[in-house]
């Protein structure tokens, strides 16, 4: 649904892992200035811009601008980002409410609850009762004021906890078990209003805490954030599994900082880019502080993503590696519908001593046609040979192969 369903998505940079809650207008503009020079197309302001939110202890439900952080207001920030030629996106967690919020003080009964039982805090927040129209109307009204106040072109809709004490203050006892269903219908209702009233806005669902990457969400949002675990090696299994049910174009995937903030692992910038290319592609880091070598490689990384994005979005996807069986390597392939080209990607997770070069068989090619790898146009190989004899993934001793842990390689095959 929506105009982005079949379109290439903007290459965004999200400030979450760059700043967490510690940001202001000047910091976001600094990130945007550097990002715009590198070819990044959108700045997304994540959690911490509303209420009086300096940590996860407050303000969910108070969807008005935190003036202490955004001096000059939201429109000023968005206008400054737009002047750089970039789009602007914003984070909401519309289903949640903090005990320390104006909304909870005014309407404590709006939280999902079972009468007589204490409410369970998770990430210092409760869940709003979306079975109630007055709750949805209030949240939508606050979101609408924000969206109408500036040129916002993307929403990240987050959900950072599961449901507990699943009951409603308005339902009779014999109908309390309906709340699970009524709640989801309420979420759909609000998303429907958003996507109807703002069809130009790209809606990305995000549910690291609620584990809600599902077809219902995909109807309203053409992309969903896979996981807050952004480590490239962790993402191999995450994205492999997600792609079994959902198109790669729906998988939110970013190049993040190193050491990775979740697992502490260092991986090459190139590998992080190759893994993120399988999904929507973007950046989750502070471009003003990363090593110069990494910063300098971003324009070429973006160029590579743009070159192959249509093939990734519309081609046939083949999972060639078996990370769940042999966690030393992974590989995948995208083949154009007309079999005119194929993109093969390989990640060496762990280097091993005295191991033979791997021979990997491609899939989905035209058996009787001939193909050449983009960097070797004079070397033509039949599709049958590529699929039955395979290709040799060179090892480090020949001078041009893969060296060490966490390295990657892509090969682009073109039909003659």
Ranges and model annotations:
Residues 13, 43, 81, 139, ...:
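Conserved, mostly hydrophobic/aromatic
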Residues 19-22, 50-56, 95-101, 161-166, ...:
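Flexible loop/turn segments at secondary-structure boundaries
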Residues 270-321:
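Catalytic cores of secreted or luminal carbohydrate-active enzymes
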Residues 350-416:
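C-terminal beta-sandwich/jelly-roll accessory domains of carbohydrate-active enzymes
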């Amino acid at each position: 649904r929506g105009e982005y369903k079949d379109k290439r998505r903007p290459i965004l940079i999200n400030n979450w892992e760059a700043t967490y809650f510690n940001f202001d207008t000047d910091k976001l503009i600094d990130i945007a200035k550097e990002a715009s020079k590198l070819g990044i197309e959108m700045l997304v302001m994540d959690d911490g811009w509303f209420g009086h939110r300096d940590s996860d202890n407050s303000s969910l439900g108070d969807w008005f601008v935190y003036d202490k952080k955004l001096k000059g207001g939201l429109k000023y920030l968005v206008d400054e980002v737009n002047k750089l030629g970039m789009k602007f996106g914003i984070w909401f967690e519309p289903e949640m409410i903090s005990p320390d919020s104006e909304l909870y003080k005014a309407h404590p009964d709006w939280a999902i609850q079972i009468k007589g039982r204490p409410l369970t805090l998770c990430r210092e927040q409760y869940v709003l009762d979306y079975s109630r129209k007055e709750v949805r109307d209030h949240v939508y009204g606050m979101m609408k004021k924000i969206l109408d106040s500036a040129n916002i072109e993307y929403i990240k809709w987050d959900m950072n906890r599961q449901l507990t004490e699943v009951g409603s203050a308005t339902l009779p006892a014999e109908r309390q078990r309906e709340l699970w269903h009524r709640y989801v219908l309420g979420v759909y209702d609000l998303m429907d209003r958003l996507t109807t009233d703002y069809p130009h806005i790209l809606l990305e669902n995000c549910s690291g805490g609620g584990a809600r990457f599902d077809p219902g969400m995909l109807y309203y949002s053409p992309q969903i954030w896979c996981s807050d675990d952004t480590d490239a090696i962790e993402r191999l299994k995450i994205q492999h599994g997600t792609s079994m049910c959902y198109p790669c174009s729906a998988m939110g995937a970013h190049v993040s900082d190193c050491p990775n903030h979740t697992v502490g692992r260092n991986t090459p910038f190139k590998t992080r880019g190759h893994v993120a290319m399988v999904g929507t592609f973007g950046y989750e880091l502070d471009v003003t502080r990363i090593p110069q070598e990494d910063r300098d490689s971003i324009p070429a990384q973006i160029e590579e993503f743009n070159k192959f994005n249509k093939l990734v979005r519309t081609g046939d996807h083949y999972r060639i590696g078996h990370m769940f069986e042999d966690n030393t390597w992974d590989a995948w392939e995208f083949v154009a519908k007309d079999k005119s080209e194929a993109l093969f990607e390989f990640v060496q997770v762990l280097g091993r001593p005295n191991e033979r070069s791997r021979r990997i068989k491609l899939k989905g090619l035209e058996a009787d046609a001939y193909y050449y790898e983009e960097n070797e146009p004079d070397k033509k190989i039949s599709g049958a040979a590529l699929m039955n004899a395979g290709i040799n993934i060179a090892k480090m001793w020949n001078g041009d192969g893969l060296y060490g842990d966490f390295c990657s390689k892509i090969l682009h095959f073109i039909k003659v």
